[in-house]
Each structure stands twice: as structure tokens, then as C-alpha cells.
């Protein structure tokens, strides 16, 4: 039997936390691992209960969601985990600078707080499998503003094969594995293998980090 996706709900509004908790618990294959009302307690609970997905509000007292995300993905914390944790940030603004910063720190995407319960649960499942949750156009607009002066391309990128670079560019454009497979005339399993190699060589966590890497180093289309 497949283990349920364990979700940590982080928001300073108790009513919102309670509502999300009800939605998650009602879904087959999901459970609530805990709740927190600020970033400091969120970081502590991630270490204690090791959730699969964190729903992270951006604007909270004590410690906001951006700083909490940064601390969650500190190398020393990541090294202690037996499985990866994904962070999905929640915001009331479509193009939010704080969301872009959280994505740079390791978040897998962002959702507006007025999404439907179905969209929320689909997003949880998606980030749990390592996908990004946001439209490529939204991500492009966010990252364009963040990386106006790209940094030099690191040696790790130069280690990618020609085919891996083609897949890298396609992921940076927001294409799915199915779309990439059609573009490079390969099977989806081959594309998955290439994506895995890219993540390993560049020391990245997931596809959204490939997009961030592309913008950070001036490799975005």
C-alpha cells in the first residue's frame, strides 16, 4: 500500500489552516503531518515530523515564509533528511517578489490562496513527484525581475552532454516530458533519464530548480 502524502500546513490565520486541514484530510492518499502559525515553528516541525510537502504562507509574524523556506533547505538540514521535502508557497498576489525569492531558495512553486480545493490537492500531488506548480509564463516574469544581471555559467553545466543540454533548454521553457520527447524524437523514459542526469550533475532538487538555474546563469530561452 502506498504511503499517504504527509502535508505540513503553515499559515498565521487559524481559520485558513483549519480549512486546508479539512481539505487535505478528506483526500485519499493524503494526511496532515502538522500545522504551524509562523515560519519558526514550521522549520522546527519540518525537522521533527519530516513531511513530504509543506504548504507555506509567505507573510507571517516572527519569521516569514521566505526565511522559513531558506532555512528548510540549508544544506545541513537537507543532509539529515531520509526523504526530500517539497515546499509550495501560498500567496495572494499573482506576481509576488517574495514567491520568486522562495523559489530561488528551493520552493517548488506557488499557488494563489483562492485556488479551489481540487487545484490545491492536484498541486500537492504534483510537487510531491518533483514537478513545478506554476505557469511557465508566471515563472518567467518572476525570474526575469530577479536575475537582471546573470552570473557566469558554472563548470557543472559544461559537463552536460549535447542531448542533456537540449533537454535542459526544453525544461527551462516549461515543456513536459511528453512534449520534450516529441521535440527530441525520444521516448519519455529516455527524457526522464536525461532529466535525472541533469539534476544530478547540477546538484539541483527538481525541475523548477532547472528553470531557476537557467535564469540565474543567462541560459533561459
Role assignments for model-derived ranges:
Residues 3-24, 160:
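Conserved acidic segment of CheY-like receiver
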Residues 11, 57, 91:
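Active-site residues of response regulator receiver
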Residues 29-37, 45, 204:
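Short hydrophobic/Thr-rich beta-strand motif most characteristic of the beta2 strand and flanking loop
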Residues 38-41, 64-70:
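Acidic catalytic/metal-coordinating carboxylates
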Residues 49-55:
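Active-site beta3 strand of CheY-like receiver
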Residues 60:
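Receiver (REC) domain active-site loop signature in two-component systems and cognate sites
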Residues 99-104, 108-109, 113-162, 166, ...:
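Short, flexible helix-to-coil linker/hinge segments that flank and couple to helix-turn-helix
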Residues 174-209:
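Recognition helix of helix-turn-helix DNA-binding domains
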